[in-house]
């Protein structure tokens, strides 16, 4: 329930923040990343101080951080990207996000405020590499600064809403015991592959 209230507050304030930026004619394209962050941070603080509709039990510091990440960063994906235990992130729509940990897929209790916010995150991913995504080109592949692979799909190709899949690169190399622990392979399977490699046999993976 607390998460639902936080998400509702974030959606409401996200709309107000975007409206204020539009009214003030903030041209984000001509601003440095640091200038945009500082300007947005000040505007968020102003909105939070003047908005009496925010429930008293809402963590305003967390709300401000979430709003800032959503406008100038990758929204709720920022914390997921910083989590070393997560190997893959899948956004099926703005409020449906899954992560993979140790080979197991689970739904996380976080969300973007709107589908438009997901699109904004995608645009911030592809803009630095000179790519674009729109209705005429609704799918794009890219990489984050850390090398993580990104695939993004938007309507009309995506039916439920904007999709993002991020495959992170683990700092620790995967070994055969990891595959066994994750349930991806058995000891016999790994031993068979080891023998096949030792014998320089042809291996077909399909």
Q: Over which residues does each language-model region extend?
A:
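Hydrophobic anchor at the beta1->P-loop junction of P-loop NTPases
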Residues: 205
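P-loop NTP-binding catalytic core
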Residues: 83, 91, 96-201
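N-terminal anchoring/assembly modules that precede and organize ATP-driven motor systems
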Residues: 1-106
